[in-house]
């Protein structure tokens, strides 16, 4: 994954490569799981037990799920990135959340799995802490895609081999929101530029939303509908007829970073990073609440 990140930094890989290569890179991980565990049976949530029973063997679908999880984790941090301290900061919060969860579960039935996770997470946390010190605003070290892919795959490995992949996904709540919000651009339903970073205004010293500009007629009916619905719910800002002939439309790039700027207005980079990391902390608090309270509605704990 480090090599993939380096290749992306140097070669600017297309999105289809970013999906294909992590899938291939996850094969050794899936082989380790198959050789050492091989368990593909899940506990069915309470609302579905009358139809599916208490347990259900997913077979190969479980490996498909784990492969998709590895691809998501690898790219999740990479698409919520681009301002000083955000990549290392969100990785720190997620790692701290996983460590806390592992410590809580040490007295449970899966002690060895959580000790295994701690062997990875504790060194990762402290090395990332040192990186964050130099990566925070004003940054003296830049992480690039190399760190993002490495961090994401590290989380995927401990989540899969530590048998807490569902809980680990809960620690990715901001990344899931960012992914869902970004889907129209990631699937090119709405034109997606190579970089979707916020725009720096040298006059104010603040970051502003960046925009995607495209011909209005080039947008598909589905893209037009998504844009209209998103605009109605104030999720995007749309400027129509931005040229003298009225042929072009602009909309803000669909990232969580731009959405926060849309809500709060132009923001200093240090403040913006702090707000996004605060969202990550709030997401982890929600994750623990779901894991230890709301879970009772779906499972016997």
Per-segment meaning from a language model:
Residues 1-189, 195-202, 287:
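"…together with the soluble PPM/PP2C metallo-phosphatase catalytic core" -> "…together
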């Amino acid at each position: 994954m480090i090599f993939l990140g380096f290749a992306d930094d140097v070669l600017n890989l297309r999105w289809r490569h970013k999906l294909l290569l992590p899938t291939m890179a996850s094969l050794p991980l899936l082989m380790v799981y198959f050789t050492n565990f091989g368990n593909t049976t899940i506990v069915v949530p309470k609302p579905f037990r009358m139809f599916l029973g208490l347990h259900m063997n997913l077979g190969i679908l479980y490996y498909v799920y784990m492969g998709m999880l590895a691809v998501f984790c690898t790219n999740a941090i990479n698409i919520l990135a681009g301002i000083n301290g955000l990549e290392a900061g969100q990785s720190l919060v997620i790692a701290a959340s996983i460590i806390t969860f592992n410590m809580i579960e040490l007295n449970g039935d899966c002690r060895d799995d959580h000790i295994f996770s701690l062997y990875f997470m504790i060194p990762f946390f402290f090395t990332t802490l040192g990186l964050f010190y130099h990566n925070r605003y004003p940054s003296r070290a830049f992480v690039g895609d190399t760190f993002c892919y490495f961090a994401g795959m590290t989380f995927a490995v401990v989540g899969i081999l530590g048998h807490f992949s569902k809980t680990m996904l809960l620690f990715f709540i901001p990344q899931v929101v960012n992914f869902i919000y970004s889907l129209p651009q990631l699937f090119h339903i709405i034109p997606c530029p190579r970089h979707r970073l916020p725009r720096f205004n040298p006059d104010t010293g603040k970051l502003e939303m960046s925009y995607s500009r495209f011909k209005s007629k080039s947008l598909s009916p589905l893209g037009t509908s998504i844009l209209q619905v998103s605009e109605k719910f104030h999720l995007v800002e749309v400027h129509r007829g931005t040229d003298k002939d009225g042929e072009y439309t602009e909309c803000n790039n669909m990232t969580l970073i731009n959405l926060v700027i849309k809500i709060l207005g132009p923001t200093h980079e240090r403040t913006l990073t702090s707000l996004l990391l605060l969202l990550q902390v709030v997401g982890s608090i929600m994750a623990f609440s779901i894991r230890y309270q709301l879970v009772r509605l779906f499972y016997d704990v």
